[in-house]
Amino acid sequence: MSTAEAPAIGGQLATFWLDGDLYGVEVAHVQEVLKSQGLTRVPLAPAAVAGLINLRGQVVTAIELRERLGRPSRPEGTDAVVIVVRLHGEAVSLLVDAIADVVDVDPADFEAPPDTLAGQARDLIRGAFKLDGQLLLALDVHKAVSP
């Protein structure tokens, strides 16, 4: 994938940790961040659908990003952090390991996803930024929540 195929992103990204790697989503999509929430499992749902959460009376689908990105399951007894994103007027939650910071990124620093990304992850990453010696992977939130 080149930057010609995926438009560069810039501005503010809400960053989070997942399996030791730093990811980010555009702040414009983030509604709120919550501590671990009780999940109601959904029978016969795709593996990436961790369940449903009750967000002040609104039922919201919870997507397990570890599953979507082909990462190992969250260690037993470890709670996820919930990032609620709003897309096309609908709320969806993303389960991550830990929330990091909101960072400003320059579209000129946008790079194509690393060649080392494979499988499911390659399709969900828009690109990368080098941030203080750390690689920040920009998640395509629309693809991440799509079946």
Regions found by a protein language model. Name each.
Residues M1-P147:
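An acidic, low-aromatic, low-complexity terminal/linker signal
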